[in-house]
Amino acid sequence: MVQPGSVPSLRLQELPRTPLAGEGNFVWKVPYPAGHDGAAVLKVYFGSRSPLLYLKKTVGNRLLTGRTSHMPRARFRTETECVRLWESHGFRCFGMHPEVRVEGLPEGGYMLFDWTPGLHFREYFKDASVPLEQRLATWRRFVPEWHRRHATAVRLSEPRLIHENGDVKHVMLWRDGFVYFDFEICFTSRDVRDLVGREILAYMRSVGKFFGDALYERMTDELVAHYPDKTLLLTAWEHAFRNRNPVVRAGRWLDVRLKPRHRQRWSKYEVALDIRQRLDAASLTQGG
């Protein structure tokens, strides 16, 4: 039993560990009496990858793709900073327990998170046992919150409010709200409007890939109807076709024409065009 004022401590070697999904990290469900269902999630950033691979990914992130470092302690810092930032603006994330020490693990290389047995978007929206209209109502409730985060990120020029790994795998329903997770890497660009467009495309591409055409059509209709700032929603198309950097813009022009995969149904270019066409149609309808 933890005494008042003492630092909670766990011993890694004594912990029963249930592996959870996680690529490159060690992520375990572990007993934690103070946690929900008597459990917590222990995430260890020093994972299964070699130091050379961490370094290689870091060089690519920093020099080529405009992302933060992939090194273990850097990912720990990025994730914990992002969780605090998102929560400070009212977006729920997995609760953290930085006060808990785990003997046998390096400081600054792990975090104990709340065990949160919610419903992942990826599973919820394709669950035919949930009435379609109920799922669409959930999506309509999500879209304004999604927009609020985008608008806050643009207003503050804060790239850390953009979900670098954003798709329907990294949002869940929990206690009548939305919970976000996976913040190990974030973007470094200050062109936050472009990052908003990129994230919108990433989410909607995953909607199509995981849920299929019929549900994609309905969810995209709802997105266009209920996303409050249509100009900000248009950044999805601008990200694909109107990048401010002429070199990037030219490269994407060539991408579409030279690589058949970029003309497939769920490529970012096809989804961007689809969103633009729906916005144009909505504008004409309202104008009429």
Per-region residue spans from a language model:
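Conserved alphaE helix
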Residues: 134-148
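Juxta-kinase regulatory segment immediately upstream of eukaryotic protein kinase catalytic domains
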Residues: 1-23
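Active-site acidic catalytic loop and adjacent metal/ATP-binding pocket
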Residues: 26-30, 40, 148-189
